[in-house]
Structures are given as C-alpha cells and as structure tokens.
C-alpha cells in the first residue's frame, strides 16, 4: 500500500467583537491508500457558515465545500463534509484514500 500525506493546518482569526478560534484535529495525517480518515474542525463562534479548502504544493487554495446551515452535508467524490453548528464542529471525511488526495486541508469560518 502506498503512503499518502495530508497536512492539516488550523487557522486562528481575530474579530472586532473578540477572538475567534478555529482548530483542526489531527494537525498532521499520514494516510494509507484505501483507508478512511476524518479531519475535525472545531470553532468558537456561532457562525452558520463554514468553508473547507484544499491546497496542493505550489498552488493556490481551492474551495472544496461551503456549509451554510446546521446539519448540512456535502459530498464530492471521496470527500464528504458535514456541519453541526450546535457542537461548533465540522468534519471532513476521506473515503478510500488515493494519491490524488494528498494535499493540505483547511477549514475556516466567518
């Protein structure tokens, strides 16, 4: 089995009304082809809007998903994202990982 690499970074942003924290877990993930993985994104605001991005080495950010409401679920290929605004949590599921999914993944809220 080939080993894949997904780097997961967390973003911390400031707002005028206070500090907004966005944290992803795990921060680093070494994937194996064919396995399933989940990336968690916790945030401190009451925002109903969450974004997932992907960045390949040497390239600009690519928008994957925009989740606009509690319970929202979106899927594209082997990636599926969901949003639970009550828990202030979003997840990005990677199903049957393949080499093309090796990238850096980001979540963000506004």
UniProtKB/Swiss-Prot annotation:
The entry annotates sugar attachment on 36, 42
Q: Primary place of residence?
A: membrane
Q: Which InterPro entries match?
A: Ig-like_dom, Ig-like_dom_sf, Ig-like_fold, Ig_V-set, TCR_alpha_variable
What biological processes does GO assign it?
A: adaptive immune response; response to bacterium
Where is it located? Cell membrane
- Listed disulfide bonds for this chain? 41-107
Keywords for this protein? Adaptive immunity, Cell membrane, Disulfide bond, Glycoprotein, Immunity, Immunoglobulin domain, Membrane, Receptor, Signal, T cell receptor
Q: Boundaries of each Ig-like domain copy?
A: 19-110
Q: Which GO terms describe its cellular component?
A: T cell receptor complex
Q: Where does the signal sequence lie?
A: 1-18
Task: Name the job this protein performs.
Answer: V region of the variable domain of T cell receptor (TR) alpha chain that participates in the antigen recognition. Alpha-beta T cell receptors are antigen specific receptors which are essential to the immune response and are present on the cell surface of T lymphocytes. Recognize peptide-major histocompatibility (MH) (pMH) complexes that are displayed by antigen presenting cells (APC), a prerequisite for efficient T cell adaptive immunity against pathogens.
Assembly = Alpha-beta TR is a heterodimer composed of an alpha and beta chain; disulfide-linked. The alpha-beta TR is associated with the transmembrane signaling CD3 coreceptor proteins to form the TR-CD3 (TcR or TCR). The assembly of alpha-beta TR heterodimers with CD3 occurs in the endoplasmic reticulum where a single alpha-beta TR heterodimer associates with one CD3D-CD3E heterodimer, one CD3G-CD3E heterodimer and one CD247 homodimer forming a stable octameric structure. CD3D-CD3E and CD3G-CD3E heterodimers preferentially associate with TR alpha and TR beta chains, respectively.
The name this protein goes by in its record? T cell receptor alpha variable 39
Say which species the protein is native to.
Homo sapiens
> What gene is this protein a product of?
TRAV39
